[in-house]
Amino acid sequence: MLTVSGLVKSYGRRRVVDGVDFHVERGEIVGLLGPNGAGKTTTFRMTCGMVEPDAGRVLLGGQEVTSWPMYRRAREGGMGYLAQESSVFRKLSVQNNLLGVMELLGIGRKERRRRCDELLEQFGITKLRKSKAMSLSGGERRRLEIARCLVSEPDIILLDEPFTGIDPVTIDSIQEIIRGLRV
């Protein structure tokens, strides 16, 4: 499904990623572990197309995508990415965070409503649908971000530190949802 080989990235004379290799099959949950500053986020950003590697390759479904921009990896390659930084549209409601992305993807109005309701239910945020995203707790915000990442129905999702700043109970709940996505 996803093969990353020999990724290298330097900023000036500082090499932040040095020959990273990994392979992920459909249904697998794989983590990148290491101390702060080890290059995990840079590796994610190179893998999803936000940052161009100095060397190395990214294959998605057997296709070379190293030179593809992020949007193309998402649309044609089925890759979703959730950054560690907050990515909600703060002034939009929870439901409009989902509906807006679906509209950009060209999904029809009736299907947008159906999928929005489905995602709100799946992530336990239906009661928050009219709330502004800026008013959400850390766990609620993260649920919304993951739901929004799933709007495009990606084949693979890269989650960069998905549990930062979230309480243990919410972490368990989100982990359960993620495990349920493996089907």
Predicted features along the sequence, with ranges:
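Conserved ABC ATPase "signature" region
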Residues: 99, 110-128, 175-179
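ABC ATPase NBD coupling module
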Residues: 64-80, 85, 109-113
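The feature captures the beta-strand-to-loop junction immediately N-terminal to the Walker
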Residues: 33-35
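Conserved catalytic motifs of ABC-family nucleotide-binding domains
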Residues: 153
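Conserved ABC ATPase signature
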Residues: 132-136, 140
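Helix-to-loop junction immediately C-terminal to a conserved catalytic motif
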Residues: 48
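Catalytic Walker B motif of ABC-type/P-loop ATPase nucleotide-binding domains
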Residues: 157-160
